[in-house]
Structure formats: C-alpha cells, structure tokens
Amino acid sequence: MGKIIGIDLGTTNSCVAIMDGTQARVLENAEGDRTTPSIIAYTQDGETLVGQPAKRQAVTNPQNTLFAIKRLIGRRFQDEEVQRDVSIMPYKIISADNGDAWLDVKGQKMAPPQISAEVLKKMKKTAEDYLGEPVTEAVITVPAYFNDAQRQATKDAGRIAGLEVKRIINEPTAAALAYGLDKETGNRTIAVYDLGGGTFDISIIEIDEVDGEKTFEVLATNGDTHLGGEDFDSRLINYLVEEFKKDQGIDLRNDPLAMQRLKEAAEKAKIELSSAQQTDVNLPYITADATGPKHMNIKVTRAKLESLVEDLVNRSIEPLKVALQDAGLSVSDINDVILVGGQTRMPMVQKKVAEFFGKEPRKDVNPDEAVAIGAAVQGGVLTGDVKDVLLLDVTPLSLGIETMGGVMTPLITKNTTIPTKHSQVFSTAEDNQSAVTIHVLQGERKRAADNKSLGQFNLDGINPAPRGMPQIEVTFDIDADGILHVSAKDKNSGKEQKITIKASSGLNEEEIQKMVREAEANAEADRKFEELVQTRNQADHLVHSTRKQVEEAGDKLPADDKTAIESALSALEASLKGEDKADIEAKMQALAQVSQKLMEIAQQQHAQQQAGSADASANNAKDDDVVDAEFEEVKDKK
C-alpha cells in the first residue's frame, strides 16, 4: 500500500504532509516553501500557474487570478455570502445552470472543485517529488462547519486532481491530532480555535488515554464558514480606498490593477501589524488623472486596524459559547487552548481568546502546519502505520426531513459522533397517497425553508390506504467523511429508494469524469510543454556554441560551409519561435550535419591549445629548476 498523504486545502494557503516513520513531515514545494498560496492563474498564453508564480503575476492579470475559491466551493450563487463576494472579487463569479456559484475565466465556465483541483495537483506533485513514486490517495481537511454539499465538492476536487480521497476530516480535529499525538499522557479536554483565511471553527475535543491508546473524541463543534483573514483584509482595503478618495478625490475601486496592488499591500500591512505598532502603506504610481500620477502613502497603526476588525473578532466569540454549551462544559473544564490558522497570529485575536478561556493559548503548535500534520497522521491511521489512535468526529449540523406543515424534523442532531445511522417511521398526509417526497435538510431552524436543502427524492408504489396508515421508514446513514446516505422504505410493500446526498446542486458524475479527463489531458499537455522547453534550451545552446565556433574558426572554415551553417542557423532560430518540437529537433539535426567541417576545425584548435598549455607547463617546470630567488622578510612597523 502506498502512502496516504495529508492535505490542508486552505482558503489562503495549502500544505501537504506525510508520515515519515512515526513522525509527520511537512513537505517543501518546488519553490522551497512549506506552504503554497491557494491561488490559481490562467495566463494569456494558456498556461495554468499555481501558488507563488500565480501570486506574483496577480497585479497584471487580476481578472484571471483566482483566490479564496474555498469560500465558493459547494455554495449556491444566490447565497448571501456569495453575493457579498461577487461585488468585491476582481474575478467574475457567475451562476451555473444548476444554480451553483461558478467562475467565468476568459469566457469559460469553471466549477470551484475544478479550480481547487489545481492546488491539490500541486500538493500531489510535491509529495511525488519527495517520495519518488506516484501518489494516488489522500486525506483532505475541511472546516468542521462545512455542510454536506461543501464536503462532497471537496471530494470531487480530489477526484479531479487524480486522488482517491480516503477520508475527509475536520480541520480542528486534525490540529488536535497533531497536538495530542506526542503530548503528555492522561486525559485532557482541549479547545481548538481555528481562524483561517476564509473560515472559522471551534471544536471542543476530549483526548483520553487508556492502556497507551489515545482516543480523540469531538464533543462539540461550531463556527462560521464565511469568516476569516480575507474579511480582515477587506476591512483594511476599504479603509485605504476611502482615505485615498478623501485625499485625492479618486475612487480606486474602478481600477482593477490598483485594487490588486492594494490587496497585496493590505495583506502585508496586516501581517506587519502583528509584530509592529505602526506600518506605512506606500504605493507609488497607484493611479493617475489629468494632473499626473498619484501615489499612496498612508500610515496605519495597530490600534486603527483593531478598530476596523473588532466586530469580526467578536463574531468568533459567540460560537465558542455555543460549542461549550453543546459539550456540556464550562470554561474551567478546558485544559488547553490551541490556535490554528494564520489569522490567529493577530495579537487582538489571541487576547480575546485568552480573555474568554481565562488562559493563554499554547504557543507550541504551528498554526500554518498543524492541520496538514493531523491529516497525515489520519492517513497513517488508515494505512496502519500509526497505531493506538482512535478518532471520533461529529456531524456539525442537524440532519432531517421536511414533514407536514413545512417543519424540519431532525433524524440526527448536531454534534452526533460519526459514523452513525438513525431510522424513524413516518406516514402519509392524505388518503390513498401512492408516493411521498423525501426532502432532506441540514440546519438548526424549525421551519424547513430556513435550512439548507440537501436534495430530495420520491418513494413511489405505496399501496392505497387511509392517511396515517402506511409505514414509511426513513434511514439516515452518515459515513466517516460526514457525507449522508438516505433511504426510504414502505414497510408494507417492501418498496425501497436510496440516494447518496449529492445536494440539489453539486457536480454530477458526468461532469466530474469530464473534468478528470481534462485534468489528465492537461497533465499530458504540461509534459509536452516541459519537453518543448528542454528542446528549446538545447537548441539555444547549440545556436550560441555554433556561432562562437564559427567566429573562432575564422578563415579556416571554407566559405561554402560557412554559408550552409549560417543558413541552418537562421532556419533553427526561425523554428525556435514556433511550438513544434519535432521541427526544432529536425533543424538541430540539419545544423549538426552541415557543421561537420566546423567540428573538425574546433577539435584541431582544442588539441593545439592543449598541446600549447602542456609546453608552457614544461617550460615553467624548467624555470623552476634554474631560478632560485632570494628574499628577506620585511616586517611591518607596528
């Protein structure tokens, strides 16, 4: 069995880790970094860039540089959170035919899982380069508060990237695994506060140790899947835009290039203010008007940033109270607080969390790497490399069906340990009803319409009977990934209908297969592109070395040969401007054939040089015998 890699597919950054013996190891990508920006760019010449290369060109290509895609994955276009992003993102968010939030990239419609798959492919390649073997299996993490559609979409992204997703696990749970595996023995209750680039989670986790086996049991989880560092950046960007408008009378929101530069500067300023009390946002030539170029130079203090984002930090406190209440615990029951996600480096966040729990968060957990490490540990558990670890996660939201009067009737309540299975018997609402519609919902509201619709299906062939007589057994079965399977059975006729919830939206099997094929085709195209680049480099080297040899040969090279070589060189240089690898190779071969006389001259010159240097060495040796210099040491006067 090959390695199961652990991937933290983050909103802002992603990270990949593997089990190396009994220790998890975070892997460096091709750029030498342990985390990779979750940024994907589609360039004008058709190239797809991922990570740092994509980030570097964002200023000049804002419409086709995609970031924070995790905020759209598994979401409907009409969702309130998506509509908020539509107005502020430089790229174009559109509604797919099924109502999902998709993206328009250079006129092509693309699904968020398809785009996230590019990041996963880079993580896969990073692991393959390190291991020296193909990687086909992964554990991928998601925010604990992700709903069924978002989890399913994440699995789809894995498939498109060529990975079999062996398990989806919650990010705070993964962080707890990373923390708890090598920590002190005994029973502990920990709170994992996870504020990342786009999502927020809180999980209360109990770590029990019995006879050397550690059980990680999630007692409760809560959160907000649309709260994170991107929102903090937006507040600072808006402030800078308004300040510039007051000063210069120009609204930068109408200038995509300026906004992209401003986004980078705001992110940098936010990070600097975690360690400094003040920073300058200095952007020369940010824009121009009839009077000439305009420059931005605005001082931002830590206090100013904190005043801009205080309500965002406070938004994360309410879920902490709910999670503790759901776990049946008080603040004093928590032994350790762990911070995960880059945004937790902000001193204000650390202070608020410390105030709430009455204790300082631990500083020995890397907020950027803990989640990927935990995913790798779970991969090790699945392969049997990691023993004596049992992970008991929960479903974050209640699951149920719509019943008479538009009511949501839960079958599985939130914070139930998974995997789990629950059945309940329902009946018909009308006399002689021959079919029922099972409408599956996820959420905590009483009214069905206020919850997230996960999908619906019909159970037909119910025998005619007075209302309330037929017995229809509905079974909900949640697997270890937190994905729901629903069945409905008429106990009288034995008729049964089953579905795996794919949401009323989501990608269908045909779409996923098409994207898998496209990804494979792209991989082939990437391989051909690499080969073309290598051939071009060889040809460039050949052109350079041949010209140098022609120059060195001088009059020794016959005029006919020189003309033939110049002609072959021109043909090769013209070929280099094209994309045809075979043509470049043919022109290289042609140049080699007409350069045979030149090669002979070059070899003769090389041999003469060697002989000359040998003679010089011999003369020097003789001189060594004859000359015996006398010298005396002159000491410097101190």
UniProtKB/Swiss-Prot annotation:
GO molecular function: ATP binding; ATP-dependent protein folding chaperone; unfolded protein binding
High-level lineage: Bacteria, Pseudomonadati, Pseudomonadota, Gammaproteobacteria, Enterobacterales
Biased composition, class Low complexity, residue ranges: 603-620
Pfam families: HSP70
Signal sequence coordinates: none
NCBIfam families xrefs: PRK00290.1, PRK05183.1, prok_dnaK
Gene3D superfamilies listed in its UniProt record: 1.20.1270.10, 3.30.420.40, Actin, Chain A, domain 4, Substrate Binding Domain Of DNAk, Chain A, domain 1
Keyword Lyase: no
Residues spanning the membrane: none
Annotated gene: dnaK
Residues the record lists as Phosphothreonine modifications: T199
Statement: the UniProt record of this protein carries the keyword Endoplasmic reticulum: no
Residue ranges of coiled coil: none
Region Disordered, annotated ranges: 603-638
Name listed for the protein in its UniProt record: Chaperone protein DnaK
UniProt record similarity statement: Belongs to the heat shock protein 70 family.
InterPro entries: ATPase_NBD, Chaperone_DnaK, Heat_shock_70_CS, HSP70_C_sf, HSP70_peptide-bd_sf, Hsp_70_fam
Cross-referenced CDD domains: ASKHA_NBD_HSP70_DnaK-like
Top-level taxon of the source organism: Bacteria
Function per UniProt: Acts as a chaperone.
HAMAP family, per database record: DnaK
Induction per the UniProt record: By stress conditions e.g. heat shock.
